[in-house]
């Protein structure tokens, strides 16, 4: 394509076949190697921060899940075995179930498994809190939340040193 044809296409506003599809980069006055360390440290900081957040999320999610699974698995297995061997659930239980358990024994297993779940949930919660307390230095800090604001104290409260008992809130657990 000649120079004259290019000029006429540019004047008309029509794109030519040989025109570049993407805009060209502007020439920079600064050298890119000067900015590379700055960009690398910013990118690395973002990567480390998001990595810590992901590890913290997984620890706070997987730790309770693992503890509760390990503690509650025996009770769930007992309930499953009770349902597996009961004749109303399976019309023809296997020969092992018939040899080991009657329908009354299967019902007893189901009841025992379900009644053992609440104490095991409490035990799992205690084990989780113990693990969190021991792993606190390794776990990332939770997100910062603003401190609750206290209402301004009146001059009467300051003179007594204690707020009125009616205004004071106590919660017993």
From Swiss-Prot:
| Membrane topology field | Multi-pass membrane protein
Source superkingdom: Eukaryota
Renumbered to this chain, the Acidic residues biased-composition regions fall at 1-14
Cellular component GO terms, alphabetical: membrane
Tell me yes or no: is Transmembrane among this UniProt entry's keywords: yes
Q: According to the UniProt record, where is the region Disordered?
A: 1-25, 141-165
UniProt key word Nucleotide-binding: no
Transmembrane domains' residue ranges: 31-51, 53-73, 107-127
The compartments listed are: Membrane
Q: Which UniProt keywords apply?
A: Membrane, Transmembrane, Transmembrane helix
Q: Which family does it belong to?
A: Belongs to the TMEM88 family.
Protein name, per record:
Transmembrane protein 278
């Amino acid at each position: 394509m000649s120079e004259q044809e290019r000029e006429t296409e540019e004047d008309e506003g029509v794109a030519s076949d040989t025109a570049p599809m993407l805009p060209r980069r502007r020439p920079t006055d600064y050298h890119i190697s000067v900015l590379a360390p700055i960009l690398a440290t910013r990118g690395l900081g973002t990567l480390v921060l998001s990595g810590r957040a992901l590890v913290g999320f997984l620890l706070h999610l997987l730790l309770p899940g693992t503890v509760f699974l390990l503690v509650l698995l025996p009770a769930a297995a007992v309930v499953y075995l009770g349902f597996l061997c009961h004749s109303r659930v399976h019309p023809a239980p296997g020969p092992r179930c018939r040899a080991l358990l009657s329908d009354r024994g299967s019902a007893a297993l189901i009841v025992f498994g379900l009644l053992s779940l609440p104490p095991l949930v409490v035990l799992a919660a205690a084990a989780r809190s113990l693990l969190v307390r021991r792993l606190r230095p390794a776990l990332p800090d939770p997100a910062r939340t603003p401190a609750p604001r206290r209402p301004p104290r009146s001059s009467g409260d300051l003179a007594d040193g204690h707020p009125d008992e009616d205004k004071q809130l106590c919660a017993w657990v």
